[in-house]
Amino acid sequence: MTEQLRQAALDFHEFPIPGKIEVTPTKSLATQRDLALAYSPGVAEPCLEIEKDPAASYKYTARGNLVAVISNGTAVLGLGNIGALAGKPVMEGKGVLFKKFAGINVFDIEVNEHDPDKLVDIIASLEPTFGGVNLEDIKAPECFYIEQKLRERMNIPVFHDDQHGTAIISAAAIINSLRIVGKKIEDVRLVASGAGAASIACLNLLLSLGMKRENITVCDSKGVVYKGRDDKMDQTKKEYAIEDNGWRKLADAIPNADIFLGCSAAGALTQDMVKSMAAHPIILALANPNPEITPPEAKAVRPDAIVCTGRSDYPNQVNNVLCFPFIFRGALDVGATTINEEMKRAAVYAIADLALEEQNEVVTSAYGGEGATFGADYVIPRPFDPRLIVRIAPAVAKAAMESGVATRPIQNWDAYVEKLTQFVYKTSLFMRPIFSQAKSAKQRIILAEGEENKALHATQEVISMGLANPILIGRRSVIEEKIKKLGLRLTAGVDFEIVDNEDNPRYEECWKHYYELTKRKGITPAIAKRVVRSNTTVLASTLLSLGYADALVCGLFGSYGKHLASIRDIIGLKDGVKTAAALNSLVLPTGNVFLTDTHVNSNPTAEELAEITLMAAEEIHRFGIEPAVALLSHSNFGSSDSLGAPKMREVLQIVKERNPHLMIDGEMRGDLAMNEAHRKELMPDSPLKGSANLLVFPDLSASRISYSLLRGTTTAITVGPILMGMNKSAHILNPGASVRRIINMIAYAAVKAQQE
């Protein structure tokens, strides 16, 4: 490690707050009543319920989503026996991964105890605190004994990740590598270098998957493990000892081996050894930080090899983060009393099968836009694949239920999988009613920028989710080439439709229609012909106007204003509507809030704002949410007559006249809009109850500044902008829109088209 990187790592852990984790309350502690409920005397009630029924601890405490990461520091990463305290940064890091990838809370516990029996007693005594235990960085062979004793004594999952996490990912890599080379697990011969916790766990799992014990040869630092050897032989090694056939070194055992499993040391596997392996060798060189052999070294002598390492700078990274958060997620969610072999095997196949699917846009973005398809350089999923949680956790949970170790079985699997998506896509719960409605009657949705990578990834997801029938505008050759490059499973004419703007059979109909709509706006036939061929938003709007689609989504490049001008010219405003406007939603940890007008009107009149407010309230209803509207200003309830305050008071009167049942009040400052207690101090009889969920701003500057601040200073996720007031469902995103935002907008556009 360079000195610069070393210092960066130290700074990362020290600033702005030492360490990587903290405890955050999940309940409000703002009032005396809150304290009385959270602690004395209110806390006595859940205590008494748990005393009557210990299972109630999962109902009234955080235990069901809390895992202990426990280590004695005897085998820390590649650092060895550095002690419990020195290993604490690693354990905190493990906790961060649990939280990031699976939403699981963690207490890291470093125990300064080397005696296995005492360590077992200490850990077992902590069972009332946790829903599961992740053992970490405990050296072999003690780790085998400790885990086994804890599994016998505890009624919660105990999982030594160094053993089983590595084993599960390695097994998935081997399963898929065998698929690629056309070999069967019961026929192949494996040579292992290393006989520590990870290696033995890998071998045990492979046996349960069908590998034959007689086809396995194990080597350690003393050479081949064979019957009759006395040096450094413990019980776990003896189980894999072969008959003495004269082999003494790794070099003796490796010729004609199909698989090399390395959990040993850098350089242990030489190029000469690789040369001697069977056809299409499978090499797992998992030593860290440097593998037994690097992929370039192995490929130089055996181009037909499939090589996996533990490093992120090579293909096929065997990384435990691919499984441990999701195995615990599934185990916790069904109240599993253990993690058994059935659950591990379920995880293996869930991981292996995911690699067979098309690439996800989140993964592609995380790896610099680089796509991958199943093959020698992509045998297991990548760690940032958001589908891991929705594949592994349900598979593990089902296996727990089927094998009889689940105490809280899942009844509704669709709802469970949807709940899991919230750990990846924060808009999932918010968009649930929209997705359900979109699926009920699929609409034809045009994506104006169909050649964009994000549009193609969104199309793949939309089709997989059954949300709509996409129509992509773009050059057919470009779209098909990008689909291939991105590793997507899309077929034009089967999964989606292409409208090739350079070879459009409806070209004449489109340009003539566009000309008729715009001939009094300076558009000549010659201009119309050129624009319809070159401007994809114009073409999309024209197709929508002609009835060849039900809705459109555009804006992945170009300015909002130019897209809006095209849509307004061709689609036009809805009957009775005088102005278009934009509505954005922000999904915040404290709830969802809508803001308007965020894109269109720079300084709308009171009449225009009233119309915008009523349109926004109608849009909010589509999400199954009852609008609670705050008209914002710098003043509160008539305290000022300057700037936009009088205008907002006029808006209130107009809206009340047109919709007396809408919950609305104003004008008011933003803090009053979001805090009912403060609002009541100034206006006790305000009809607005709770926090406002629709914020109406006096002008574009105020709305854009507020929107940007909320997005930039919170963890808010945006949905929108939703274009309101148009004659058909047409919406404009922005160039920074994520694939998920495109998917959300396609679904919303579809629902709006259904209802209009």
Swiss-Prot record:
SMART domains linked: malic, Malic_M
Gene Ontology annotations of biological process type: malate metabolic process
Catalytic activity: (S)-malate + NADP(+) = pyruvate + CO2 + NADPH; oxaloacetate + H(+) = pyruvate + CO2
Keyword Metal-binding in record: yes
InterPro entries per the UniProt record, alphabetical: Aminoacid_DH-like_N_sf, Malate_Decarboxylase, Malic_enzyme_CS, Malic_N_dom, Malic_N_dom_sf, Malic_NAD-bd, Malic_NAD-bd_bact_type, ME_PTA
Binding site for a divalent metal cation: E136, D137, D162
UniProt enzyme class: oxidoreductase
GO molecular function: acyltransferase activity; malate dehydrogenase (decarboxylating) (NADP+) activity; metal ion binding; NAD binding; oxaloacetate decarboxylase activity
Superkingdom assignment: Bacteria
Binding site for NADP(+): A195, G196, A197, A198, N288, N320
Active site: Y39, K94
Family matches, as Pfam families: malic, Malic_M, PTA_PTB
Cofactor(s) for this UniProt protein: Mg(2+); Mn(2+)
Documented EC number(s): 1.1.1.40
Ranges where the record places region Malic enzyme: 1-428
Region (Phosphate acetyltransferase): 429-756
Family: In the N-terminal section; belongs to the malic enzymes family. In the C-terminal section; belongs to the phosphate acetyltransferase and butyryltransferase family.
Protein name: NADP-dependent malic enzyme
Species of provenance: Haemophilus influenzae (strain ATCC 51907 / DSM 11121 / KW20 / Rd)
